């Protein structure tokens, strides 16, 4: 029996080979071909892909098959739709953008300075804020926004997050609120911490974990709620998450002001204490919702003006006095409070390099300072009814009295 079974099985295999030999051969070749493709030189495969891409894109207008004259030239994304610059739910028109200004940037080794400057200015046109967004939320008050942002500053200091992270969160919060209606105050903390959660993941190398963000809310927000709100915010903002923040503009201005002979702008070269002094003025100003009336670049330039001079401001920002005059006057009571109370000393954080310490967001009694600034604003308004210039406005020093070496800072 075993012998007969073996003979019968052998005959069946021979029959199958005769009937389906071609199919088996094709399958075998197919397997070998797949293995060959898998094991071939990846450089050869990438070269084929590059040649195919060049052949397919040869007729595109931006490909002239010529050597690029400027290797630092930036190529715009083709067929990219213009950003929507209007908030659909906003009842107020967005603020007027300041006219384009000349580039103060030096010659850059890594890009064309005019193109970089153009991109920076375009961000101010596409990332809009609405100072009147609270009109869409009858149950909210300006004080609630100030309390929330002050708390976010405190969270940033606890977790040693950067100033850029805080200002990204502030921008996300304000722009998100401009797209919504009738938000209740019980949701503000969730929106704020979710905005900071997004900002930290974008900016920080080692952002805090989700449970750490939930922990600082003292049980008011769960991790799942933060994740849900995170997605809602990003969808409402149409995934536009890379604005040029107030502190980013300040960093650019300070870099240009303290350029060395090599004109390098890759690493900070300005005094940290002066940066902190100006940054704390901006920290106070951003708590007032009226700051959204001005573009971020003007806010940073106005803060720099209050601690330097008109000539330096114009040199590093490209603005003229008429461009920032209203913002400078609006900022006067805030600058007076900062000057009276004094700026904080540079704090050193464990695990943070000394050269990066000024970039860590710090917290002080900002709400008390805000109340003092508003009181001074009311006092100045009373005093200035008969005066064209508000008292306390810093008058630019005369050119003959300026120091000959280095930028002049207060």
From Swiss-Prot:
Belongs to the cyclin family. Cyclin E subfamily. It comes from Homo sapiens (Human). Residues 396-410 have a biased composition (Polar residues). Essential for the control of the cell cycle at the G1/S (start) transition. The keyword Phosphoprotein applies. PANTHER family: CYCLINS. It comes from the Eukaryota. PROSITE patterns: CYCLINS. Residues 1-20 have a biased composition (Basic and acidic residues). The lineage of its organism: Eukaryota, Metazoa, Chordata, Craniata, Vertebrata. GO terms for cellular component: cyclin E1-CDK2 complex; cytoplasm; cytosol; microtubule organizing center; nucleoplasm; nucleus. GO terms for biological process: cell division; DNA replication initiation; G1/S transition of mitotic cell cycle; homologous chromosome pairing at meiosis; negative regulation of transcription by RNA polymerase II; positive regulation of G1/S transition of mitotic cell cycle; positive regulation of mesenchymal stem cell proliferation; protein phosphorylation. Gene3D superfamilies: Cyclin-like. It holds the Pfam family Cyclin_N. Interacts with CDK2 protein kinase to form a serine/threonine kinase holoenzyme complex. The cyclin subunit imparts substrate specificity to the complex. Found in a complex with CDK2, CABLES1 and CCNA1. Part of a complex consisting of UHRF2, CDK2 and CCNE1. Interacts directly with UHRF2; the interaction ubiquitinates CCNE1 and appears to occur independently of CCNE1 phosphorylation. Interacts with INCA1. Coiled coil: none annotated. InterPro entries: Cyclin, Cyclin-like_dom, Cyclin-like_sf, Cyclin_C-dom, Cyclin_N, Cyclins_cyclin-box. The gene is CCNE1. It is found in: Nucleus. The modification Phosphoserine is found at residues 103, 387, 399. The modification Phosphothreonine is found at residues 77, 395. One of its GO terms (molecular function) is kinase activity. Residues 1-30, 378-410 are annotated as: Disordered. Phosphorylation of both Thr-395 by GSK3 and Ser-399 by CDK2 creates a high affinity degron recognized by FBXW7, and accelerates degradation via the ubiquitin proteasome pathway. Phosphorylation at Thr-77 creates a low affinity degron also recognized by FBXW7. Ubiquitinated by UHRF2; appears to occur independently of phosphorylation. This is G1/S-specific cyclin-E1. Keywords: Cell cycle, Cell division, Cyclin, Nucleus, Phosphoprotein, Ubl conjugation. Highly expressed in testis and placenta. Low levels in bronchial epithelial cells.
